[in-house]
């Protein structure tokens, strides 16, 4: 039996494989930046309907919300580790808020959080 030929009419040539059809462009989709901007704006309009906010102020507020979120999440994580639990519950979050926020601010935050959790559980 004769050996197969690799060159000749039927042989495939090694080269670049065509990945995209001949009309497609190389434009890449931009990654979306997530922020709390729309929620900050909604709260602003509830409290002061006639007041606006600059993009610089919005950026500062967004950084503030991210910072507070990270602090509360970190503290709640530590509390769940101390209690040998693998899940962060509303109890850990509430305790973290009490530890991180001072006096009256903590009381208001806890009551608003409790109200939000109650509203969520009743809507289910």
Curated annotation (Swiss-Prot):
InterPro entries: Histone-fold (IPR009072), Histone_H2A/H2B/H3 (IPR007125), Histone_H2B (IPR000558), HISTONE_H2B_site (IPR055333)
Gene Ontology cellular component terms for the protein in this record: nucleosome; nucleus
Gene3D superfamilies recorded: Histone, subunit A (1.10.20.10)
UniProt KW Nucleotidyltransferase keyword: no
Pfam entry (one): Histone
Keywords of the record: Chromosome, DNA-binding, Glycoprotein, Isopeptide bond, Nucleosome core, Nucleus, Ubl conjugation
Keyword Nucleus attached: yes
Transmembrane domains' residue ranges: none
Functional note: Core component of nucleosome. Nucleosomes wrap and compact DNA into chromatin, limiting DNA accessibility to the cellular machineries which require DNA as a template. Histones thereby play a central role in transcription regulation, DNA repair, DNA replication and chromosomal stability. DNA accessibility is regulated via a complex set of post-translational modifications of histones, also called histone code, and nucleosome remodeling.
Protein name per the record: Late histone H2B.2.2
Naturally occurring in which organism (per UniProt): Psammechinus miliaris (Green sea urchin)
